[in-house]
A protein has these predicted regions:
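N-terminal amphipathic alpha-helix/helix-capping segment at the start of soluble metabolic enzymes
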Residues: 1-19, 80-86
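Hydrophobic faces of well-ordered beta-strands that scaffold small-molecule active sites
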Residues: 15-19, 44-46, 92-96, 121-123, ...
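Catalytic cores of alpha/beta
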Residues: 26-36, 152-162, 204, 208-224
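Active-site beta->alpha loop and helix N-cap motifs at the rims of alpha/beta catalytic domains
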Residues: 37, 48, 61-123, 256
């Protein structure tokens, strides 16, 4: 288990923002990390852009297109993380797709991610049954391979939870990422099932966009993950987005910490 990830859940309910690297630019992404940390983020998910992000809705898909057409590469993302690590020790995990890792070379990717100071990896398109080829390498280099658990059978939730590292990413609804007006999944029951098997922090993501939802989800879990609503601000304000994102993250963090 990565120490930094574990610690990010020890200070109360965690708020975990997601941004796409290089949207609007890698320089702005770096500034966003510092701003979100100042606003109270406990852990940050960095998306490495990919041409076919199957788990993403239109907002994050558009961000991937913008980042790639701006010339973002995996190596440039690594260089940016290295720069961030000179100024910040906030826990950070990559969220990307198996193809990004494969095309870079799996061991080369994981080794480099660990070297530049990343703490974990989320691969939403790799099912539990196929995580073996990443699992051993991640453990070898001290990177937590974060499991996603979607609304599914009790047996499957227990099976995935048993092998969880870092934290468990509880997917609030089936389908792609994006902002939803209501979340119907019984997150509390899902979290209880995980906890029966393993004492792992559970953070909820997919579909959370406003403070009311964040507060509700934090009440049933250990933390809240928000992506599309933040990426939407990056798309809307471009290079001017940093203060808007900072303000939004602060409002969400405040909601998550309300008792």
């Amino acid at each position: 288990m990565n120490k930094r990830i574990t610690e990010s859940f020890t200070k109360g309910k965690a708020f975990i923002p997601f941004i796409t690297c290089g949207d609007p630019s890698l320089e702005v992404t770096e500034q966003l990390v510092y701003a979100m940390e100042e606003a109270g983020a406990d852990l940050i998910e960095l998306g490495i852009p990919f041409s076919d992000p199957t788990a993403e809705g239109p907002v994050i898909q558009a961000a991937n297109v913008r980042a790639l057409s701006g010339g973002v590469t995996t190596d440039k993302v690594f260089a940016m993380v290295e720069k961030i690590r000179k100024n910040s020790s906030i826990p950070m995990v990559f969220m990307t797709y198996a193809n990004v890792v494969f095309s870079y070379g799996t061991e080369r990717f994981v080794k480099k991610a660990a070297e530049v100071g990343m703490d974990g990896l989320i691969l939403p398109d790799v099912p539990f049954e196929e995580k073996e080829e990443f699992d051993g390498i991640c453990k070898e280099y001290g990177l937590d391979l974060i499991s996603l658990i979607a609304p599914t059978s009790h047996e499957r939730i227990s099976m995935i939870a048993k092998e969880a590292q870092g934290f468990v990413y509880c997917v609030s609804s089936l389908g792609v990422t994006g902002m939803r007006s209501q979340i119907t999944t019984d997150i509390g029951a899902m979290v209880d099932l995980v906890k029966k098997v393993k004492d792992s922090p559970c953070a909820v993501g997919f579909g959370i966009s406003n403070p009311e939802q964040a507060k509700k989800m934090a009440g049933q879990s250990d933390g809240v993950i928000v992506g599309s609503a933040i990426v939407k601000l990056c798309g809307q304000y471009g290079v001017e987005c940093v203060p808007y994102v900072k303000e939004y993250v602060k409002s969400m963090k405040d909601a998550v910490r309300e008792d």
